[in-house]
Amino acid sequence: MKIQIHNHTSFKIDSYQQLLIQLFSQIKENNQMHLVFVTKEKIKQLNTFFRKKNFVTDVLSFPNEFSFNPNLKDDSLGDVFICFEQAQLQAQKLLHSLEREIAFLVVHGFLHLKGYQHNNEEELEKMIHLQEKILKKINLERKK
């Protein structure tokens, strides 16, 4: 699967780009997605505008409407926005690497683009299981 990465922050993301390209090369799909790293201010603005939730969040996903209509040809699943600063805070709080946190969030966003939701505990557990299964491909699964 192809991943297009855009950095709209002042943070250096080169090493994370390589990690994510490696991760998504393991996913055998003919689609692509756009990943955009944004600031706290931008993700809060997006969250407020699109979800009516006025706070900073870690990841937002916006599926490409074409992906749900097989008659329209567009290989983009959609866009995933990651707040780099929020990912840093969460990695510190959860006591794992920033690489793992970013990969976890990107995979979470990817699964939302694929139609997965977590509106209840069962759906959340299924999603987390899938995230860990994907992250295991590059040895970033949660350590027990």
UniProtKB/Swiss-Prot annotation:
Localisation: Cytoplasm
Residues where Zn(2+) binds: H108, H112, H118
GO cellular-component term (any): cytoplasm
Swiss-Prot/TrEMBL keywords: Cytoplasm, Endonuclease, Hydrolase, Metal-binding, Nuclease, Ribosome biogenesis, rRNA processing, Zinc
GO biological process, one term: rRNA processing
Cofactor(s) required for function per UniProt: Zn(2+)
Cofactor note: Binds 1 zinc ion.
GO MF annotations, alphabetized: metalloendopeptidase activity; RNA endonuclease activity; zinc ion binding
Similarity-based family: Belongs to the endoribonuclease YbeY family.
Biological role: Single strand-specific metallo-endoribonuclease involved in late-stage 70S ribosome quality control and in maturation of the 3' terminus of the 16S rRNA.
Annotated protein name in UniProt: Endoribonuclease YbeY
